[in-house]
Amino acid sequence: LPPSVGGALANLAASFAGRTTVNLNYTAGVAGMGSAAKQAGLRTVVTSRLFLEKAKLTLPEGLEPIWLDEVAAQVSTFDRLTALALALFAPTRWIEAACGAERAPSADDVVTVIFSSGSTGEPKGVMLSHANIASNCAALDQIFHVGPREKVLGILPFFHSFGFTATIWFPATSGLGAVFHPSPIDAPAIGELVERHQISFLLATPTLLSIYMRRIAPAQFGSLRLVLAGAEKLSERLANAFEDQFGIRPLEGYGATECAPVIAASQLDFRAAGFYQPGWRRGFVGQPLPGVVCRVVDPDTFEDLPPNTPGMLLVRGPNVMKGYLGRPDLTEKALREGWYVTGDIALLDDDSFLKITDRLSRFSKIGGEMVPHGRVEEELHKAAGVSVPTFLVTALPDEKKGERLAVLTTMALDAVPSLVEKLSSSGLPNLFLPRADAFVKVDALPVLGTGKSDLRAAKQIASDKLAAR
């Protein structure tokens, strides 16, 4: 199901019933959904005929559908009033019984299995407990101080951990209102919804923010109090351009599906008579959430590193997953003495603000030196003078140096030579400079259904086009 009231209610009801939900990634196609369904042992799928028709989807074999639109048509006025009375006045155990729970769900029960995006490898089923989700929601409530009259726009898919936690459970546990729309790229509808419902909180990916900049009038975002970007790096140029256009600066958060998902988040500055506490810093993703502990260690020895020193980021807290579904081998690698090994290179400054340099998998080892793809992308965008995503860097094998850079771009290739020349005068080391013949023209940069860059697809496209060069 897409982001919708029906989809949110189905997830809530299943959880009250003591069931474990698996929100299938409908952008992964029948094969991708079938793989997830098989791994999770699914027998029943709750969906909508109208959604399947509009999305031109077919269900994987072996799944028995419950058509939510048909169920909704059978709900009487008495049913609605009864449900309202239960929601307003009944204790939780009565609601659980009404939803079909055979026993009271415990905090340690798995509430959902979310399959990782697969941007760098095969998707893995991440098992998150009620306690994992509840702790993340409680921490978000502590730093954002939401009120019952405020609303969040629910546009991130529920198969995305940020969408699941921040637009289903965070509103349900904090009293924050939620307005849903099934398509995060439907910019005209999103602008209209924010304006009509006076949305306070917008949660999106940087890719989505760049779309909204092109298609939404500044006045439509006038009610926003907080714009929080996650799932991929928010560049300084995009944050500045968004602020220039809409008058509100998007703040950056950081997380992982394995951490339910928020690990750290920028927040609004605290101001009072005689007090000022900054809530964010340029180039950083904020401070760890309450209850979450971060360590930066040497990737080889796992020894702690001093502040302001880049290294492997480890995370510990009540939000860290129970493990990977059916993969104890991967769980053992990911959880080291209770610490989740993120695979991200990061640093903590003296005030515990966290900066993510890049994923370890987004470095190329060229001639023995580590080259960060994110840094190269940032300099390419600066040299081209563009604020929307135009370049995506990947790497291909190279017989002489181990690896070489390859760049996907939506820019015309005849502009590449002058761009490379400009880049060479930017002060970047020579190993960081892609060759002019290493660029591949694409109509659009590959993006996953979660809004993150599809790194696997990028590498495959580059390999298909450049392998012979």
Predicted regions and their residues:
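AMP-binding/adenylate-forming catalytic core of the ANL superfamily
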Residues: 45, 202, 317, 322-323, ...
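Conserved AMP-binding/adenylate-forming
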Residues: 1-28, 155-157, 370
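AMP-binding/adenylate-forming catalytic domain of the ANL superfamily
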Residues: 68-69, 403, 428-453
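Conserved AMP-binding/adenylation subdomain of ANL enzymes
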Residues: 134-151, 159-200, 215
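Gly/Ser/Thr-rich phosphate-binding loop
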Residues: 80-84, 88-89, 199-204, 213-280, ...
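Conserved pre-ATP/AMP-binding loop-to-beta segment of ANL
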Residues: 65-115, 122, 145-151
